[in-house]
Structures are given as C-alpha cells and as structure tokens.
C-alpha cells in the first residue's frame, strides 16, 4: 500500500471541474515530463514569464524541473523515508508536516514533494482585474507544496501547516503572504492558534482584489484585510487626542477658580493660531493627510439656537456696513504657505484645509465685542469662545474628529494691553501682602493659550448668515468622501465642502418682520475763525437739509436764506456739499465755519481742519 502511494504523484484538482470525481494518478511520470527535460527552463524563459506578470508559474516550473532531474531510484527512496516519518507525526500535530533529519544531509540536494494541502486561487478567464494584466481569483484548489531540503543559497520558501481538509476559500477573509518573508517567520511550530482558519492566498501581487483595500506593513509583510470594514481603519490615525491648537495672545493673570482661562484680544487685531498633530502619530508620514478645520466665534453660555441667532442679528443690524463679518482671516504669506481652500462659510466661521504632515498657521481677527449684543448700557457682556472643529475627509461623516475651544474677551482701542497692565499692577501690590500673609503664588504672564478639547462632538454649532446674503453663500450638505487619487496632489481649489448640514441652522422665525434701522446721526465739530472752542452740530438727518437746519438753529441764520454750502478739503479743493459727503465722510470731523452774506442770501464754507 505504501509503495503504491509512493508511485503516485500529487495532482491539481479544481473544485468546479467536471472531472473532480474521476481522479487518476500517473505512474509513468518520467514519460510525462520527458518533453520538459528536453526543453529545459532557461533564464530567458523565466525572464519573459516574469515580464508577463507570471513569476509564480516560473518558480513552480523551476521547482518541478529540479525534482524530475533526479534519478527515479534516489527520489523514491528519499520520499519513502520522509513519508513514513510524516505519517507518524501527522496524527500528533494535527496534520502539520515534519522534515526528516536524513533529508537535511548535504548529499540530499533535492526537494521532496509532500502531499500537504495548500490553497491557491485559480483565476477564471472571464473576470479581468482592474490592472488589466491580472485576473480576479475565483476558484480554490488543493495542491502539493514542496519543502526545501537543501539548496546552494538561502531559501526563500516557508512551510505552512494546514488541516488536511479541502474547502472553498471564503472571499470575505483573505491573508496574502509575500514571497520575500524569511522561512523562520512562518514555520509549523510558530503558527497562531487560529491559523487553520486563515489559508494562504495566491502569491499574485494584486493591489486590489474585489475592491478590498490593501494595508501595507513594513518591510516584508502585506495583509489584505477583507473581513474588516473600510470605516474601521480608514484614517485610523486621526483620533480625538491627536490635535493641539494654540493662540498667541495674552492670557488673564487672575483666572477665576473653576472657569476656563480667559484670553484678551483687541477688536480687529489679527492673532496667529497654530494647528498641529501631537501624540504617538507625530512624525509619521500620512499617505492621506488632508484635514479641514473650521474656526468660529460662538457664545460660551449654553444658549438656544434661537437666542444665538437673535444676538447675531442684533449685532449685525448695528454695523456700519452689511458686509461686516464677526471673524476675518488675514492673507499673510506665512499663513498661506500652510493652509489652502479658504472659505468664509458664515459670518462667524472660516473653513480651510491643512496638512497633518506640517503645522497649519492662520491669522484671525474678531470684530465683535462682548457688549455688542445688548442695547442696555453698563451690562456685563456675553462671554465668547473661539472654537475649532477638525473634520477628516475619510470618515464619511459630518461629525468632527476633534473639537476644542478657548474663552476670549474682546476689547476696543488696545484695551487688552490695558487690562493686562491693570492685572500686573494689582498682582504687584498683592506680592507685598503675600510676603507677610503667605497667600497663593501669583501667575506669570504667558502669551500662549492652548485650546481645551471638548468631549461633545455631536452638537452642531450655530452659524450666522444674514438673510440678504444667504442665497449668495456657497455651501453643501455634508462633507463629501473623496478617493485617495483625489488626495494625492493638492486639493482642487474649486471644491466646496462643508462639514455642516443646513437643516435648521439658519432658519428664521416663521413670522418675518422687516428690520427697521434707526436713522444714522452725524455729528460735526465747527467753530468760527475768531473762536477757540468748537460747537457741536448734531444733524437729525444725515442730509444737506439736516446740516442747514443745524446751522440755522445754532447761529440763528434763516434757513430759507441759506444758499450755497461748500466744503474745503485739506488739499485746498472746494466742493459742493451734498448728502453723500455728509452721510459717509463727515461724521465727527472738525471744520472752520465761514458764513458770508451776499445779496440777501448766505454762503456757508466748511474748511476741514
């Protein structure tokens, strides 16, 4: 029985082959390979097969060629000894092959074929791979694998122990081993417990098989994870604790217990904000490294959406121009070297793209005070926050991967510096008392504020867009997922992606009321040339008629006798005064007033000082 078994050579059986049940063995194997021995596999033939992408076939034919070059008697004797020893160890090690010690002698420079089931994938002719020259695997078969006995150079093969059961390879779980893996990495003695459920795939070097992404591990092993969903590992390096944002501005020297650190800003002044990646992934080059961040000014208190929109609308109604924004970004060269795709997505928010492999830097100014949201005088202003949300292009979600904030207080006319000086003065006075009383140590002045991370990533921020400009703003519903091919180079500047959904962010109450703007008042400071003190002329309406009424009331000049009114600029240009000059270019200006009477009418000349 054993001799008959040795005379049979292993065969390749396809599962979906019609002759699957009709197995037969070839006893006269020397005649079967006689033609092959007469036409040996030359180096040129191997090179041509490698160029055509069939390196594995070249390796297999070379293995068979070396096997059948050996005389039949030596081959049968070596195979019999190996077979007897392997059958004894087969039941002990659950079918794992063992190599005989005799086969490792220097004289045995052959490779013995063992009938160990090993799965390869046979491609069908009607399915073509995405790359064109490779085919998509479809059928799994059990073939024999050769154990390296002795070669002249270092062997690149490895032995794999598998259960002797023929089964179809599940398409959802594939493990592909590289041919360059050393033999000591994968042997029959160090297989993991679940190795029986992982059958080696074909060694075709396909990058994509049935749209399953391939994950590369340096330097010599690549795993194609078919059972893992793409959302589980795509952009896995972007985690909530991997970002840090810093604002270069002065912080309060007297923080209140339990409150966040207060940062003082001047209205309209630009401050740099640096965005970078930190943690264990710092320094690792990301193949897809673009992220989008949104910097916005929001209210610190937990106010409802309606209250926030009401405050923003009140602030916007009191601005000199409808184009006034709550937050602006500077076009500094230092900033634009690190960011791209800048979008003013709302009056209180700015979006841009930056690279994780480099630090992003932007210069931001805030144009609203904390006291601008109420008409009452002397009330404490509403606290404001600078909030930064960072979104990944790969997580296919409108939920940010990181969110952080810092509390700010905005002053006008260099008020931030005055506030810091006042706190320093109070702190210096307290130091004298601390020496005697021994109070808590004072805080040192720092000009760097680190944004504090937020755990709530689900709440959508309120973005303010005035009704008059709502239709002109470019925005979309969600962050659109983009393929890695689109991210290889610079993102297309024309791509407009917002991480917000517009559902009810900017909806106004059902009953809209027209906004009634209070008439703008113009104040002029005038004096006669013979006088030293200025008089204030308050124009009830910013028109030429309003100016005539104010002059008539102040200097008792009959309004019906006032003729021409001129304005003399600092350059000496004399122009006719009209409504536009009074409304837009004369508020709180100082003038010399000259009143001349000629022919029963008065001519007024306002000379700009």
From Swiss-Prot:
Compositional bias ranges of the Polar residues kind: 185-206
Region (Interaction with DNA): 371-380, 418-421
Region (Disordered): 183-207
InterPro entries associated with the record: CP2, TF_CP2-like
GO molecular function (one): DNA-binding transcription activator activity, RNA polymerase II-specific
Residues covered by the Grh/CP2 DB domain: 239-465
Transcription activation: annotated span: 1-91
GO annotation (BP), single: regulation of transcription by RNA polymerase II
GO cellular component term, pick one: nucleus
Keyword Transcription among record annotations: yes
Disulphide bridges, residue numbers: none
Pfam family, one: GRHL1_C
Keyword terms: Activator, Developmental protein, DNA-binding, Nucleus, Transcription, Transcription regulation
Subcellular compartments: Nucleus
Domain of life of the organism encoding this protein: Eukaryota
Keyword NAD set for record: no
Signal peptide: none
Summary of the function given for this chain in its UniProt record: Transcription factor involved in epithelial development. Binds directly to the consensus DNA sequence 5'-AACCGGTT-3' and modulates expression of epidermal-specific genes, including XK81A1. Important regulator of DSG1 in the context of epidermal differentiation. Regulates the maintenance of skin barrier. No genetic interaction with GRHL3, nor functional cooperativity due to diverse target gene selectivity during epithelia development. Functions downstream of BMP-signaling cascade modulating endogenous bmp4-responsive targets.
Classification via PANTHER family: GRAINYHEAD-LIKE PROTEIN 1 HOMOLOG (PTHR11037:SF16), TRANSCRIPTION FACTOR CP2 (PTHR11037)
Further comment: GRHL genes (GRHL1, GRHL2 and GRHL3) show a paradoxical lack of redundancy despite their extensive sequence identity in the DNA-binding and protein dimerization domains and the fact that the core consensus DNA binding sites are identical. They have related but remarkably different functions during embryogenesis because of their differential spatiotemporal expression patterns during development.
Family listed: Belongs to the grh/CP2 family. Grainyhead subfamily.
Disease: Defects in grhl1 are the cause of defective epidermal differentiation.
Quaternary structure and interacting proteins, as annotated: Binds DNA as homodimer.
Name of this protein: Grainyhead-like protein 1 homolog
Origin species: Xenopus laevis (African clawed frog)
């Amino acid at each position: 029985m054993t001799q008959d078994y040795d005379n049979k050579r292993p065969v390749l059986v396809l599962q979906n082959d019609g002759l699957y049940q009709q197995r037969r063995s070839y006893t006269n194997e020397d005649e079967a390979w006689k033609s092959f021995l007469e036409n040996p596999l030359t180096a040129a033939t191997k090179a041509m097969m490698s160029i055509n992408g069939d390196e594995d076939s070249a390796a297999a034919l070379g293995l068979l060629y070396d096997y059948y070059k050996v005389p039949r008697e030596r081959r049968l004797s070596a195979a019999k000894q190996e077979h007897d020893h392997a059958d004894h160890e087969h039941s002990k090690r659950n079918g794992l092959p063992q190599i005989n010690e005799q086969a490792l002698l220097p004289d045995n420079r052959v490779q013995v074929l063992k009938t160990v089931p090993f799965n390869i994938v046979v491609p069908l002719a009607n399915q073509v791979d995405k790359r064109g020259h490779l085919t998509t695997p479809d059928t799994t078969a059990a073939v024999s694998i050769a154990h390296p006995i002795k070669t002249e150079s270092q062997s690149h093969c490895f032995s794999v122990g598998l259960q002797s059961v023929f089964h179809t390879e599940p398409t959802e779980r594939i493990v592909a081993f590289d041919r360059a893996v050393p033999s000591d990495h994968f042997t029959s003695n160090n297989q993991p417990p679940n190795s029986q459920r992982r059958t080696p795939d074909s060694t075709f070097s396909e990058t994509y098989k049935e749209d399953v992404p391939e994950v590369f591990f340096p330097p010599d092993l690549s795993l194609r994870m078919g059972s893992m969903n793409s959302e589980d590992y795509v952009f896995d390096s972007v985690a909530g604790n991997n970002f840090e944002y810093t604002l270069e501005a002065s912080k309060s020297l007297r923080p209140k217990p339990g409150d966040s650190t207060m940062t003082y800003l001047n209205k309209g002044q630009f401050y740099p904000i640096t965005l970078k990646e930190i943690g264990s992934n710092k320094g690792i080059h990301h193949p897809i490294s673009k992220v989008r961040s949104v910097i916005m000014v929001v209210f610190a208190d937990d106010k409802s959406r309606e209250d926030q929109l009401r405050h923003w609308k009140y602030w916007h109604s009191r601005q000199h121009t409808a184009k006034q924004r709550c937050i602006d970004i500077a076009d500094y060269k230092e900033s634009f070297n690190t960011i791209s795709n800048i979008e003013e997505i709302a009056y209180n928010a700015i979006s841009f793209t930056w690279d994780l492999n480099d630090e992003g830097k932007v210069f931001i100014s805030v144009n609203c005070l904390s006291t601008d949201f109420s008409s009452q005088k002397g009330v404490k202003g509403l606290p404001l926050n600078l909030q930064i949300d960072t979104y990944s292009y790969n997580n296919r979600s409108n939920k940010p991967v990181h969110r952080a904030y810092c509390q700010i207080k905005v002053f006008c006319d260099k008020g931030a510096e005055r506030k810091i000086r006042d706190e320093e003065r109070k702190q210096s006075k307290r130091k004298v008392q601390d020496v005697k009383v021994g109070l808590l140590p004072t805080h040192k002045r720092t000009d760097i504020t680190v944004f504090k991370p937020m755990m709530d990533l689900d709440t959508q921020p309120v973005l303010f867009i005035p009704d008059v400009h709502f239709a002109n703003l470019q925005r979309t519903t969600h962050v659109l997922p983009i393929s890695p091919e689109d991210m290889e180079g610079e993102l297309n500047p024309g791509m407009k992606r917002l991480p917000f959904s517009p559902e009810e962010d900017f909806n106004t109450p059902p009953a809209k009321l027209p906004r009634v703007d209070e008439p703008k008042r113009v104040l002029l400071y005038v004096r006669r040339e013979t006088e030293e003190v200025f008089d204030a002329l308050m124009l009830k309406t910013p028109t030429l008629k309003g100016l005539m009424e104010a002059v008539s009331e102040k200097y008792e000049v009959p309004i019906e006798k006032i003729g021409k009114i001129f304005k003399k600029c600092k350059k000496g240009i004399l122009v006719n005064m009209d409504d536009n000059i009074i409304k837009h270019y004369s508020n709180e200006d100082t003038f010399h007033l000259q009143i001349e009477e000629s022919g029963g009418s008065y001519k007024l000349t306002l000379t700009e000082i």
